[in-house]
Swiss-Prot record:
Name recorded for this polypeptide: Undecaprenyl-phosphate alpha-N-acetylglucosaminyl 1-phosphate transferase
GO molecular function, one term: glycosyltransferase activity
UniProt xrefs under InterPro entries: ECA_WecA-rel, Glycosyl_transferase_4
Swiss-Prot/TrEMBL catalytic activity: di-trans,octa-cis-undecaprenyl phosphate + UDP-N-acetyl-alpha-D-glucosamine = N-acetyl-alpha-D-glucosaminyl-di-trans,octa-cis-undecaprenyl diphosphate + UMP
Presence of the UniProt keyword Transmembrane in the record: yes
Organism of provenance: Escherichia coli O157:H7
Family to which this protein belongs: Belongs to the glycosyltransferase 4 family. WecA subfamily.
Location of the protein in the cell: Cell inner membrane
UniProtKB keywords: Cell inner membrane, Cell membrane, Glycosyltransferase, Lipopolysaccharide biosynthesis, Magnesium, Manganese, Membrane, Transferase, Transmembrane, Transmembrane helix
Pfam families hit by this protein: Glycos_transf_4
HAMAP family: WecA_Gammaproteo
GO CC annotations, alphabetized: Gram-negative-bacterium-type cell wall; plasma membrane
Amino acid sequence: MNLLTVSTDLISIFLFTTLFLFFARKVAKKVGLVDKPNFRKRHQGLIPLVGGISVYAGICFTFGIVDYYIPHASLYLACAGVLVFIGALDDRFDISVKIRATIQAAVGIVMMVFGNLYLSSLGYIFGSWEMVLGPFGYFLTLFAVWAAINAFNMVDGIDGLLGGLSCVSFAAIGMILWFDGQTSLAIWCFAMIAAILPYIMLNLGILGRRYKVFMGDAGSTLIGFTVIWILLETTQGKTHPISPVTALWIIAIPLMDMVAIMYRRLRKGMSPFSPDRQHIHHLIMRAGFTSRQAFVLITLAAALLASIGVLAEYSHFVPEWVMLVLFLLAFLLYGYCIKRAWKVARFIKRVKRRLRRNRGGSPNLTK
């Protein structure tokens, strides 16, 4: 396998997914698989919810054209296919949370039983001894599957954000695996990025606002499930290339946002799944940034946190328990900002006004 072959495959995946996306959006409008504007959604017109379906089609295409071994490929496609199908039904008919959670749990059980993919160890996060989970690992795995799916679902609030954050996660995992010699899994991660990029282009309106699409619950479910699947493949076992604590850094922003928001809702006596406008992108936009600027800032923050995890993985001199402590400190800082969102927004607005005044007051230099 050489870089030319890999590049050709990735370009083929990108082109296939792009063509499929244009086809799928036409079908979606005919069958009513569209997002309608309401008091919480500010877009105009009916937007096809086909981003996730196109990404899944791109991965099916990937597994069909590549000639290298991807572990549990058929099992993954079957499990992911069920989740995408249920997600599409939810996008169309609004299925209850209990039904979706039950199906996600069932898929998680199939993954553990037939793929032997489960959390058996959390690594050395408490010092010099390994935290082996035993039978409790099966229950924690189900929670991890649910958490990953919901974490990526909850960040899908502004254009481009879900795509950007998922690309950061897959890029971080792919880089670690590539340099560790786990080529097939690395290519899978890069193929996910190639399949997501066409969605980002249409979602951001780069090819024109008339072609806009949304990811839908089918897409966020697929992305979250794929992330946790690959992490289980790579963080468990005797010769795992990624430490379990590194996984926290790789999905830091979606994970922090989900935990902070759910905690805030529960404290208010609300359902953890009830919608509100307290997510990180809402905070940044209240500070005066546009939706596009918020997307860029959050994606860069996610890339920074993921880079910390990747560098620590390669350095080998930072203990896993130290990385856990640092992650918890980062999470506490995030929670502080969310809890005092109005203060943070006011501070950012004040800084922006000062910067504008400084730019406006600087003398013009002429030759």
